[in-house]
UniProtKB/Swiss-Prot annotation:
It comes from the Bacteria. It comes from Pectobacterium atrosepticum (strain SCRI 1043 / ATCC BAA-672) (Erwinia carotovora subsp. atroseptica). Part of the 50S ribosomal subunit. Contacts protein L29, and trigger factor when it is bound to the ribosome. Pfam families: Ribosomal_L23. The gene is rplW. This is Large ribosomal subunit protein uL23.
Amino acid sequence: MIREERLLKVLRAPHVSEKASAAMEKSNTIVLKVAKDATKAEIKAAVQKLFEVEVEVVNTLVVKGKTKRHGQRIGRRSDWKKAYVTLKEGQNLDFVGGAE
């Protein structure tokens, strides 16, 4: 059993993009920014507990940070983890519905 405190730290924010919107409409998949050390099991448990929906599968990937310049200095943005969470048939979760 995963502690509730950990579940709250796993999910960071919804990732809103054209690709994420298309995935939601086409395959009932939500895209989230998650903690870099989060596992698929933790992500699944957190989504089910916090949003009260049934999760079918979780796919994850690590987005590499871009190299950026500020004048002569070269820096690098942090890497972050993205999760594609596919909900079971009939389940619905709408992040941007309140913005319309």
